[in-house]
Amino acid sequence: MQRQSWQIVVMVAAQGLALAGPVRGQADAGLTKMLVESYDLLEAGKLAEAQKIYEQILQQDPGNPLALNNLGAIKVKENRFPEALAYLSQALDRAQGYKLKVNRVCDMQGLCLAFRPLEAVYGNQDLAPLVQLNLSLVKAKLAEEKK
């Protein structure tokens, strides 16, 4: 009887997970290492080197929302706001359900935040609200410049 109860619990749990859909996070430890390395370059002001790594990440994991967000932050630092907006919009489209553990945050001119993941594959922070904040700040800056 107890064995049957455990089977039912396992089946119910499996169905619940299937209905919830997959929890997306950093794809693997190799990508996480690249995300950490590129963030460190970004924070050190080596934007071209950081951008190159983010582009490599996107070749391996097209649409990676953290890479797209941080590319948007680079474009903010370069005062290329329309490009930043494009990257952030792409990031937001893909950020729903993407979880990470943020280790550090880099402020780009008070307009955009870049995020350094903890060296772990999954986390508990939803990326979407963070990207939405960046998108709102860049849109406000563009609107201000048009005045």
Map each language-model feature to its residues.
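Canonical tetratricopeptide repeat
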Residues: 70, 104-105, 134
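Helix-start (N-cap) detector for alpha-helical repeat units in TPR-like alpha-solenoids
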Residues: 30-31, 65-66, 99
